Regions:
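Small-molecule-sensing regulatory modules
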Residues: 16, 21, 25-202
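Short loop->beta-strand "edge-of-pocket" segments that line small-molecule binding or catalytic clefts
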Residues: 2-16
Length: 202
């Protein structure tokens, strides 16, 4: 929409804070104003609210959409088809983690079991990613420094690349202090000299 005002649906203070600064720099037209409106409900409900009303955009976690459309269970087939069909009606932008880090631990699933259930624990261990556990723990440790809480304007992402773990951190404290960090957390020795910047910084 070639308009100077955008009306965007989002329920996340973190996303609202980041997008207020991100969108004016990266959209191909000048923005005079961005209005954010709160939205509730599951993913299909949110998408339908967006399509059925006069809004310019909606912000949704890519991890949530990926899980729904890639679900192989028969009972989710129609839902997956519906979401794909609605996505095709829209133009989509996947914002870079360097500018819009995720909520700490976003996309990770936690499973609580009894210690004595060895069979179940063994099966869970076989599908557990140790690097993901490390990244989630690092993200949560940083969030604790800010007091924690999902209503804060704080994004923290750690993810693995051929150069090592990348650390992206951005947001605003409860005292109104802005912060931003983008770094290689721990370096790996790169054997292939032809490794591209896209691999190091996806």
């Amino acid at each position: 929409k070639n308009s100077k005002t955008l009306n965007i649906l989002s329920s996340s203070p973190r996303r609202i804070y980041n997008l207020q600064n991100f969108l004016p720099k990266y959209l191909p037209f000048k923005l005079d104003n961005i209005n954010f409106q709160n939205i509730r409900g599951n993913i299909p409900t949110r998408i339908n609210k967006f399509l059925d009303n006069d809004f310019d955009a909606i912000v949704i976690a890519k991890a949530a959409i990926d899980r729904l459309i890639n679900n192989s269970f028969e009972e989710y087939r129609n839902l997956s088809f519906e979401i794909k069909k609605n996505i095709e009606k829209c133009l989509w932008m996947v914002t870079p983690l360097s500018e819009n880090p995720t909520s700490p631990g976003q996309g990770a699933l936690g499973i609580e079991t009894k210690k004595e259930n060895n069979d179940l624990n063994s099966k869970i261990a076989s599908i557990t990613s140790q690097i993901d556990i490390k990244c989630v723990n690092l993200e949560r440790d940083i969030l604790k420094n800010y007091g924690g809480g999902c209503h804060q304007k704080i994004g923290v992402s750690f993810f693995e690349t051929s150069a090592g773990l990348i650390h992206s951190e951005k947001g605003q404290t409860e005292d109104g202090v802005n912060f931003s960090e983008w770094e290689i957390y721990n370096h790996k020795k790169i054997k292939d000299k032809k490794v591209s910047n896209d691999i190091i910084f996806p």
